Amino acid sequence: MDRYLGFRLYGTMASWGTIAVGEERQTWSYPTKSAIVGLVAASLGVRRRDRKRQRELAEALELTVVVMESGMLLRDYHTVQVSPQRRRVRYRTRKAALESGELETILSSRSYMTDGDYLILLRLRSP
C-alpha cells in the first residue's frame, strides 16, 4: 500500500526561487520540489548541509502540487551596498566585506508571490 502525506501551504508572501543570477531573484508561481523537500527535511531534523540525506529524501519522494490560487506577483526593488569583486578575495562575513573600505551600490530586485494557496501531496516511493 502506498504511503502519502498531504498538506496545504498558504502564505501572504513567498518566493519559490529559481536560479539566482546577479541582482535578479525570480520566483516560480508554485512551490518547487526543492522547497518542499527542504520543509520536509527540516521537520525531520535533517540539516541543510547534510547533502546525502537531502538527496536521499528528494529521490524517495514523488510530488504533486495543486495550485488553488497562484496569487499575484510582487517585485521588490532595493539598493544594496557591496564590496567590489576582487579575485582571490573572499570575505567570511558580510560585516568583514562592508568594513573592507570601498563599497559599491547595486540595484537588486526580488520577486515574490502574494496570497498563494497550494495543496501538496507527497508519495513515498517503494524501496
Where do the PLM segments sit?
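Glycine/small-residue-rich interface belts in oligomeric ring/scaffold proteins
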Residues: R3, T18-R88
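Charged, low-complexity intrinsically disordered regulatory segments in eukaryotic signaling
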Residues: M1-R8
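Short polar catalytic/cofactor-binding loops
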Residues: L9-S15
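Internal, well-folded beta-alpha domain core
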Residues: V67-P127
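Functionally constrained cores in energy, signaling, and assembly domains
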Residues: G6, G22, S108-S109
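Generic beta-strand structural signal
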Residues: L5, L61-L63, G116-I120
